[in-house]
Amino acid sequence: MTDSFDYKQLTAHLPPPVFVPLPGYLPQTPEAMLASAEQFHADMARRRTTRDFSTQAVPRRLIELAMLTAGTAPSGAHRQPWRFVAIDDPAIKAQLRAAAEAEELKTYRSRMPLEWREALHPLGTDHIKAHMTDAPWIVVLFAEKFGIQADGSQRKNYYVDESVGIAAGLFIAAIQMMGLVTLTHTPNPMAFLRELLGRGANERAVLLMPVGYPAANAQVPDLQRLPAQAIIQWNVSAG
């Protein structure tokens, strides 16, 4: 093909894209924008991964809103390849915990290399996962590797990991803004989650997130976030 080739000819058989006015945009003054941004940063700066949960009930609507917020994430070709499964049934949570602890015990005993053990040591983790039954909710995030169309054929999804990662971030932010806490738990391996929750072969478990209120005596590791100069650069080029 030459440089003059019109690539739009390749989709000429499809109807033209449909566009609508940008919905819901609300202009703000620079002062209001700065105040909102600073408040959001302050709220998120208080976020900590938490393993000590209260058993206090959390309304289902809050969990639903967090998942719906996650569903507003951008995605490759707008495929929206995320699927959330929310569980508050004590029997199912106990089943998930037993399966997770069985896998984690194998990991801590023999699968985990020394470098990984040393990296996890400051977090004080082990194979006991009480948070899975203490927290009132468990939300499992699955990535849809490919879609299944009405005729049973596969539909390719694009940038699945990136899209699902963004959705996870929005979910975590929503939980934080509600005054709840969560933990991004990644049992290794995670195939048991798909099997126990009856998900399709086209889905892959990405995160298991207990959600709830922190326990009255909740503690977190004494860790520090990287300073701005370590994670941000301005106008840097190789030239």
Task: Describe these PLM feature segments.
Residues P59:
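Conserved, non-catalytic sequence blocks in retroelement Pol enzymes and Pol-derived host proteins
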Residues T69-G71, P122-H127, L193-E195, A218:
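Glycine-rich, charged/polar anion/phosphate-binding loops
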Residues G71-H78:
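Glycine-rich phosphate/pyrophosphate-binding beta-alpha loops
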Residues E104-M112, G198-P221:
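A glycine-rich helix N-cap at a beta->alpha junction
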